[in-house]
């Protein structure tokens, strides 16, 4: 990592809270949390933006947008973290996530697959997007507000993933996801990075 992160023993109240939330949820402090703890106010603003978009689209669509963006970017951090969150939320099971790592999105609903494609396009060639991209979402009953929030969700993932990559944040061995599944998601991220 190209930065020094706050040590737990000398953490400010805001940083200590970030670390405590990770420990309570996952049993350890993620390296990406430690990196973002350098500026806890910015982290809080990011979390507030996420909380502003999820209500209109729901967790399933949010995770589909997040996973689509993370796969397009090649972010192992976010593929693993949000793969785990997606399994916990019942969006996809382990077999479906393993298939997703192999570019098979069949474990997702038709609407979620459309969101994944939209998020991938936003993350790889946003300058080429047209009304047809939004129309593909509208075909699944998504409203303009939801399309804006899906766009913001994918954009937020680009922001966070690319920031972690630029800061060379190390990838945690996440004990809450099967090692073979984490390895498949890492390999998928590396394919994008080449």
Name each model feature, range by range.
Residues 1-194:
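Hydrophobic alpha-helical segments
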């Amino acid at each position: 990592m190209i930065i020094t992160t706050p040590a737990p023993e000398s953490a400010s109240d805001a940083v200590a809270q970030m670390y405590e939330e990770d420990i309570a949820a996952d049993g350890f402090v993620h390296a990406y949390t430690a990196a973002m703890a350098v500026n806890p106010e910015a982290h809080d603003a990011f979390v507030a933006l996420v909380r502003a978009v999820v209500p209109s689209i729901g967790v399933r669509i949010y995770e589909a947008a997040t996973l689509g963006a993370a796969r397009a970017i090649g972010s192992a951090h976010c593929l693993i973290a949000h793969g785990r969150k997606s399994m916990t939320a019942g969006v996809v099971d382990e077999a479906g996530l393993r298939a997703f790592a192999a570019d098979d999105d069949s474990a997702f609903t038709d609407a979620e697959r459309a969101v994944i494609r939209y998020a991938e396009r936003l993350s790889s060639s946003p300058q080429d997007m047209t009304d047809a991209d939004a129309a593909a979402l509208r075909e699944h009953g998504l409203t303009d507000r939801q399309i804006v929030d899906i766009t913001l969700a994918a954009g937020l993932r680009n922001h966070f993933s690319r920031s972690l990559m630029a800061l060379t944040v190390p990838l945690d061995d996440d004990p809450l996801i099967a090692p073979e599944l984490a390895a498949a998601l890492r390999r998928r991220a590396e394919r994008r990075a080449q």
